[in-house]
Amino acid sequence: TATREALLALEQTTGSDVMDRIVNRNLLFAYFYGVGRGLDDAHYYLVRSRAPWHSMGCTVRDWEALMWTLPAVQLADTGLARELLVRACELHGYAPGQGVHYIDGTLFQPGFSIEGPAAFAIATDRYIRDSEDDQIVEDPVVADTLYLASEDITARRDERVPLYSTEVMPSGAPAKYPFTLHGNAVVALALEVFRRTLDEEAAAGVEDPAAVRAAIRRHFAVDRGEKARLAVAVDLTGNASLDDDAVGSLLWLPLYEALDRDDSLYRRSVRALRTEGAAPDASVSPLLPQIARLLGPEAQEVLAWLRRAPLDNGIAAEFVDAEGRAIANGGDAALAGLLAHTVWYAAHALGLRA
């Protein structure tokens, strides 16, 4: 039928039937449940999930919309991805990263996250790279958003050190210290994009991303030598936090080119994180860290776990039990998009096989 053919056209392949099932079930859910269209205005809206059993409902963070849902949609439909990117800029680009919004852009929960403005740059660059449509930066609303995002990030730079401060983690939790590892890794990647997409005069004033990455190694590494590991947040006066954030986890650093996944400092930090995260009662835990581990040294083990995990009838849930069964906030469309794209990326970019 025409419907079946249309759905098949959206599906992706990884070379593994097992991985294909995980990718495509979650990709299609993100495609249809992470995006809505207004009955009154016919405009597109990015949401956390249209599933009525998900508590976040029709709210959205810039980071989740642009870095979780959009990459999955883009795998299946670059035309829709373009419309969604422009629409996100229209609704949220005037004040990127300010917190949780309702679908119409009204602020629901305030709290500035440095990942928000960076996400607009990274999402634009990913779209250009995948679609070869570099004319999107000529769209006035996209161009304005990139300039505003660059200004917001620049305003957060420390006076002495090329690191950038935030108020909350991308999960919404208050940052224990103003300079976060995940936030600065993301900023470094965004700065690369600004250097390529802003006009010559503005681009010349953008911080060198290499300087930010060097500062990350210098200021976030705690201990030294063979015991060195990465802190999650610091204040640049000697205080540091090792408590990882479920959304802004250090596990994601290779994706932002901050550290290679084979880097010894990264691997030690991941091992320490796994040891400390092994709580005595792991009956309920976020699914997100498991997805992030697909980028690290435990990728094969995590993939085997995902093969067995029931999730929410195969769809990502925010909270799961030790076996991967959905406990709360099932039908998480944005998280389903992240799961689909991360498994696809692990297969195509990292060579992961089931």
Name every feature range the model reports, one short phrase each:
Residues T1, T106-A119, R126, S150-V206:
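The feature captures the catalytic groove of carbohydrate-active enzymes
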Residues T1-C58, A354:
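Acidic/polar, glycine-enriched structural segments that form the non-catalytic walls/loops
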Residues N26-G38, A76-G99, R129, V141-P162, ...:
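Long, well-ordered core segments of solenoidal/helical folds
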Residues L46-H54, A95-F112, L163-F179, L236, ...:
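Acidic/His metal-coordination segments adjacent to aromatic residues that form catalytic metal sites
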Residues M56-E159, N184, G330-R353:
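Aromatic-rich carbohydrate-recognition surfaces in CAZymes
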Residues G57-V60, P110-Y127, A240-D260, A282-A354:
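C-terminal capping/lid segments that line or modulate ligand- or cofactor-binding pockets
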Residues D62, L148-E151, D158-E159, K176-A188, ...:
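Extended ligand-binding clefts on enzyme/binding-domain cores
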